[in-house]
């Protein structure tokens, strides 16, 4: 039993919804960093076992869903940062096909027409990902220095500065390019701090759902971005692209205003000595009085956590490479999950959807993009339910398998049936419609599984002591792959057309096996329990059977989950 669990029992607190907050997790982090406490933890464990029957546990009660409306609205406001990024993704896909944008930032043919070269298109679309990667690593530290809430406000302001530079661009493509980099810095900070703050203020039994709302907001932003492009496409001047950019400015201001009503992370408040505010934050999230004994006990646990962290000193970058505490293994897993989210191929459709569906012969590819945006947004609601109903691991496995099937059909039809008489002799309408249908199936599978769940997994996995650093690195991997896919897609598509889909198919097959062998199930666990699961070295494919130490019966054998003398593949293919 961890030091925190022993402390909780000694203070008559066990398994409260507030355990889902990162501050609770941090005590386990301090235990990771101060192994000299082991003897003390063992003594406390013996004490608890001798007094377990006499303890009267105080817990913050689980309430009906209607009781969590306030915390849900607050988390949606934090998740609105995802809307900002989704808006950019949805609008840029249309900008590169709009006449005024091409005339201002493109190059001129000998016949007087304008065009965007593949290099310039790739850079203007994907460079925001480089800004995001840098911003996530550098600006996420603001959340540790000034609080998650103030850190979010600062990075949104940086995003606004980038938007202003883009709007002010007249005919210099590199000015627009610089503006997108600066906006990317802000979006990168948002992508780390938004899920982090949501996970720290959410009750444990709805944490996965509320963190998934970040992805829901991304899909809403993409959809409304598509709709705005459709509404401005008939204009022949800069209204085509400046109005969507101006609305992006307005959305960012709206988020800043909404953040004033969001509670700060209780852990940060305790760390800076604002105990009463920490009580109010926990009480607001769990719909109880700030004077409730369970809230007061929870704050005491957080205080003990903060003191333990201070004794251990500041976390260094070197700690993220610790294999003894399994931090490095978690970092590799988080980085892989975020990378594989991009390698599923979703941004192939989101960044270049308008261009792709022009290629399949559709007369109005902007309308098709709107349809895809609706499918993506509506499907994410299903994903919010699935993540808590079936768990993170099972959803990722089924998502990878179903997306593989959809991508095989999409690519095969594009390669063999789209141009029956050659690429220059027109496309088959039936084949094009088939590709659209399976693209919708693909987006449904993506939106319900691989779109929201990587954010959930990363927000739950890392010890609080190194959480901001690890989340920033993992998210940076996502952005870097986003840049590579966004930049090279025009070249690859031009060279191999829809054979490109087979590349994503291979990545999806790899994703399935990676999740099976390396991603544990964390559904229904507090952040501290997730930490214990990793410390115990539970095999990922056995993790759904894992039980936290304070809930185990006498017949529970934890060793059975830590090794597999005859795994399924040996049983299937080995000698009988």
Curated annotation (Swiss-Prot):
Gene3D superfamilies on file: MFS general substrate transporter like domains
Ranges that cross the membrane: 67-87, 123-143, 150-170, 181-201, 208-228, 243-263, 347-363, 370-387, 395-415, 438-458, 476-496, 498-518
Entries under Pfam families matching the protein: Sugar_tr
Glycan attachment positions: 425
Compartment list: Cell membrane
Misc note: Glucose transport is thought to be mediated by two kinetically distinct systems, a glucose-repressible high-affinity system and a constitutive low-affinity system.
One Gene Ontology term, aspect cellular component: plasma membrane
Protein species of origin: Saccharomyces cerevisiae (strain JAY291)
Compositionally biased intervals (Polar residues): 25-37
Protein's UniProt name: Low-affinity glucose transporter HXT4
CDD domains named among the record's database cross-references: MFS_HXT (cd17356)
Region (Disordered): 1-56
Activity control mechanisms: Xylose uptake is strongly inhibited by glucose.
Cross-link Glycyl lysine isopeptide (Lys-Gly) (interchain with G-Cter in ubiquitin) mapped to chain: 45
Cytoplasmic side: 1-66, 144-149, 202-207, 264-346, 388-394, 459-475, 519-576
